[in-house]
Structures are given as C-alpha cells and as structure tokens.
Swiss-Prot record:
Species of the source: Lactococcus lactis subsp. cremoris (strain SK11)
SUPFAM superfamilies reported for this sequence: Flavoproteins
Similarity annotation: Belongs to the azoreductase type 1 family.
GO MF: electron transfer activity; FMN binding; oxidoreductase activity, acting on NAD(P)H as acceptor; oxidoreductase activity, acting on NAD(P)H, quinone or similar compound as acceptor
Free-text remark on how the cofactor is bound: Binds 1 FMN per subunit.
Gene of this entry: azoR
Subunit structure: Homodimer.
Cofactor dependence: FMN
Record-annotated membrane-spanning stretches: none
The keyword Kinase is assigned to this record: no
Top-rank taxon: Bacteria
Binding positions (FMN): 17-19, 98-101
Name of one Pfam family that matches: Flavodoxin_2
Catalyzed reaction equations: 2 a quinone + NADH + H(+) = 2 a 1,4-benzosemiquinone + NAD(+); N,N-dimethyl-1,4-phenylenediamine + anthranilate + 2 NAD(+) = 2-(4-dimethylaminophenyl)diazenylbenzoate + 2 NADH + 2 H(+)
Protein name: FMN-dependent NADH:quinone oxidoreductase
Length: 201
C-alpha cells in the first residue's frame, strides 16, 4: 500500500478552477486504480503554513542552546510537520493556477517546507544530492496563455522537485484565455491526460 499526498494550491473550488477540476478527476481515477492506497489531502490556503520570515529564519539559525520564543518554537514545529508529511508520502500530486507567471504565495510557502537541507537534500563535496529519490510528484497547472512548460512557475517547480531527487512530471491545461470558446475542449483533453496518468501513478 502506498500513500498519496494531494496538495490543493488554489484558493477557490473546482467550480472556478480548471486545475482543481483536473485534481478531482485525478483523485477519482487514482482511487479506482489504487483502492488500497492511503490518500491524505492538504489545502495550502487553510493550513497556516509558516513563511520564511524574520522570526522563523532567525529561529532556524539560532543554534541548539538558544532561547526561543513560544511563537518561534511553534513555527519551527509546524514547519517541520509539513516536511515530515511530504516525506511520509510515496506520491504527491499538486494542483495550482499560475498567478503573474508564478505559483501562488501560499503554495510557495509549502514548497519551502519540502526543500530542506538534511531532510530532502544534503550537501556533499561533489555538490547537493537529493534525498527524496523514488518519490513521484505530479504537478497540475492551469495557464491562461500558452507557455509550453517554459513559464517561470513550471520551471521553478521542476527545478525544486528534481533538485531533491523526486520523479517530477507535469500536465498543464493552457490557452483558454486566448480562446475562451475552446475552454471545454482544452479541459476535456486535460482531464483525459490526468485520468490516464492517475491509472499508472
């Protein structure tokens, strides 16, 4: 039995989101193909993920014997909790829109929790080495324009998850803002690809 972590990186519901429509289709198809697997869901917009601000980063570099505030201790513990949640999953699927050429800020905060030296990668004399080897990561993204996987959001997500050693792949639905009349056609193609990926994921 494997564990799938489902990461919702959109502030709205599937009614208003093509990426979440794809995510819903993926989960439904995945459950059909892998009925024994455990599925855990994470909504980054409601999870209160600690951001890398002054309070948290100063706590990270404070040292073992430093006196931390209760707030710093809480943020460190919650940050580590999201790292551990990611590490406990065998497979991860992430769905998000592209905002201003990038992923939403809340999703970026989550990504920061899964790119941690000593946990998901390590430094060696030959350079950094990923520690999340064998972990499948599927990224579902909706782009109003057409970017062919060269948009900064996709490049960033690919770089991060390949850096930590995971098996990263992406399926995007794009171009619906250019030609709204083709939205349903583009969505149908997206859903078909997502469902097929879920069967073998």
């Amino acid at each position: 039995m494997s564990k799938l972590l489902v990461v919702k990186g959109h502030p709205l519901t599937a009614e208003y989101s093509l990426s979440l429509k794809g995510l819903d289709a993926f989960v439904k198809s995945y459950k059909s193909a892998h009925p024994e697997d455990e599925i855990e869901e994470l909504d980054v917009f409601s999870a209160d993920i600690p951001t890398l601000n002054t309070e948290l980063v100063s706590a990270m570099f404070a040292g073992e014997n430093a006196e931390l505030t209760a707030s710093q201790k809480d943020k460190l513990a919650r940050f580590a909790g999201f790292t551990d949640q990611f590490l406990s999953a065998d497979k991860v699927v992430i769905a998000n829109p592209m905002y201003n050429l990038m992923i939403p800020a809340e999703l970026k905060s989550w990504v920061d929790t899964v790119n941690v030296a000593g946990k998901t990668f390590k430094y060696t004399a030959e350079g950094p080495v990923g520690l999340a080897n064998g972990k499948k990561v599927l990224h579902l993204q909706a782009n109003g324009g057409v970017y062919g996987a060269q948009d900064p959001a996709t490049v960033y997500m690919s770089a991060i998850f390949n850096f930590i050693g995971s098996d990263f792949r992406q399926i995007a639905v794009e171009g619906h803002a250019y030609d709204p009349e083709k939205t349903e056609e583009l969505l149908a193609e997206f859903i078909k690809k997502v469902e097929l990926e879920a069967q073998a994921f």
